[in-house]
Amino acid sequence: MFGDQRRVDFVDSGVWALKFMRDEDYREFVTRFQSCLFENVYGLKASDENKVKVYGKDFIGWVKPDVADDSMWEKDDDELWRSPSKMTPVRGSNDLLEEFEEAASDGGIQSVALGALDNSFLVNDSGVQVVKNFSHGIHGKGVYVKFDNGGKRVGGSSSGGYSNLTPQKALLMRGETNMLLMSPAKAGKPHSTGVNQLDIETGKIVTEWKFEKDGTDITMRDITNDTKGSQLDPSESTFLGLDDNRLSQWDMRDRRGMVQNIAHSDSPVLHWTQGHQFSRGTNFQSFATTGDGSIVVGSLDGKIRLYSTTSMRMAKTAFPGLGSPITHVDVTYDGKWILGTTDTYLILICSLFTDKDGKTKTGFSGRMGNKIPAPRLLKLTPVDSHTAGVNNKFHGGRFSWVTESGKQERHLVATVGKFSVIWDFQRVKNSGHECYRNQEGLKSCYCYKLMTKDESIIESLFMNDKYAAVGDSPEAPLVMATPKKITSFSMSDGKAKGKRR
């Protein structure tokens, strides 16, 4: 919607523009459209009373963004971000320089596990390809670790022998010398009954762990590290698990604190050290952790919940949904910003608030009160949305990767079809940004870089921030994986020279 032009663009078997001659006609259309959208999503008339019922009285800024307090969006800005040389050109792509593109090994690529140290890993259903990390990206065909578990089954299959189900999650841990592989127990379902522990150095699956609570087998749909940087800890023995109605921490040591003797055990059991099994209806979908171990969880109903480091039982803050399921979440290292992915847009949430003593805190530490900033939406333009195709959906929205306190994330990236879409974080946070002028409703940002491949992209993610420090770029390289190729791009500062291989 372009208020200054009294124009509405939309997609329906093509891209169309609806132009209004009078300002009042345009505004009436926008108001009626938003009311109809609310009624279609929630099945309620778009009255103020029903909006408060849906969003809650503390989220009045989400209902009426024009009265929301936007000051928190620029609360933590500093001069580094305000420098014009650090700003991303609008919708430009000439400052993304392709460094390396390599074909995958036999078996292709199903997922990528980026390391912050020397290596990263390309995962498929038969093994893991080890590649080298450089300041200009990842490349080089190193050791290929073929899954070998000594005859044990792989990844939660209930039948004997190897599972033919591709690992849906690969999680690095213990100083990136080990990898946990989680595969669905049944085709078409995300739930797994356990994980396999791969020793990368020996190339062996050393243990198949079972998920169990109170003597009963249970499932998990996702796993992640305890904190943003805990995969670098060589002594790491715990990780987090998520299921539709469960949030938990798992420990690979026994209850007495001793490492389990797994040599004579067919199915060692992971210990549920803390967590909560919720009543049905939470429908958790994805989760992520901050630098201190606080947890953000996205749900099927669109809600995003924040849990502190001290309790997984009750969320400190629960942001309402906007009508679309959250399929993926990420959070900045400091916990100030949360990114949720839906099929058609990304939602960026500011978790900062001022408590009664005037101190600035995040929603992970306490109740945010009723002055909660309105979120911002990141969307494709109608033309790009049409080009992406009606069946292609956003997935895997992430911040650039920071694992140290005091560092700042600079970009956001998500994948849709053959597109990798990159937003400048500071531009999105800037309330005076040109995208937001004359907009009605929640602020939506359409300024991004668009990278295109010749096949659907599996994942788009930035390498660890330390690889920005050793190169010519202000940002670590972007890695894009398709089923057949892995490509690295450098974010040029105008001085770097690009290479094509």
From Swiss-Prot:
Pfam families the UniProt entry points to: DUF7135 (PF23581), VID27 (PF08553)
Organism of derivation: Cynara cardunculus
Annotated protein name in UniProt: Protein CYPRO4
Family: Belongs to the VID27 family.
GO cellular component terms, A-Z: cytoplasm; nucleus
InterPro entries per the UniProt record, alphabetical: CYPRO4_DUF7135 (IPR055559), Quino_amine_DH_bsu (IPR011044), Vid27 (IPR040458), VID27_C (IPR013863), WD40/YVTN_repeat-like_dom_sf (IPR015943)
PANTHER family, per database record: DEM PROTEIN, VACUOLAR IMPORT AND DEGRADATION PROTEIN 27
Higher taxonomy: Eukaryota, Viridiplantae, Streptophyta, Embryophyta, Tracheophyta
